[in-house]
Amino acid sequence: HRPQFLAVAAVAVELAPDDPHALIQESRLLFGLGRVKEAFKVAEKARQRAPKDAVVNATWGFLQLARNRNGEAMAAFEDAIAQDSTRGEPHLGLGIALFQRNRTDAAVEEMRKATLLEPSVSLYNSYLGKAYYEVKQDRQAEKYLALAKQLDPLDPTPHFYDAIRRQSVNRPVEAVRDLQKSIELNDNRAVYRSRLLLDEDLAARDATLGRIYNEVGFEQLGL
């Protein structure tokens, strides 16, 4: 339904071309469809009109991450946090940016803050689970990925991350089930295409599934 939502957002911008909230909604939907250059241009307009808006700056931060501009992304997320301390999204973004700089402890802490501020958001719990997996805290990783699955049964993200985690702890059959589930749910993703541009791409799922099938012994199904 994202193209339809984008059409509605475009009409809203036509009706109120100087409204930063209409602009940033259009930008986020464009970003969700993978149209990053267009999203960036629209977000620039929103930022010119509302440079101190937390949603505008958080979106700007994710767009900077997509353009591999880590420093600018971090600055945008820090601005967004200062402008609205109740939102989890900029903490998630800052956590991703910190991971890119190998500042893993600080990254985990930011992602933890996102889940504390908005505990019912599945996506934040997915990324916190993945963060704990990256720092080899498997029990915590398992806990938050399980919670993410409960919070949003239609989100493929926690199943994808849990497949990788389960394979790493020698539970390949369960890993296959999780990865198949993530592929089945793939078309139900919302908000961002490839979930903030990390590694949610369907091709990545297929490649991971092939490797896991091979390790389980289903070579004929592997890549």
How would you describe each model-predicted region?
Residues 32-33, 66-67, 100-101, 134-135, ...:
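Register position in tetratricopeptide repeats
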Residues 15, 49, 83, 116-118, ...:
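Structural marker of alpha-solenoid helical repeat scaffolds
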Residues 20-21, 54-55, 88-89, 122-123, ...:
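Helix-start (N-cap) detector for alpha-helical repeat units in TPR-like alpha-solenoids
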Residues 2, 36, 70, 104, ...:
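TPR-repeat structural position
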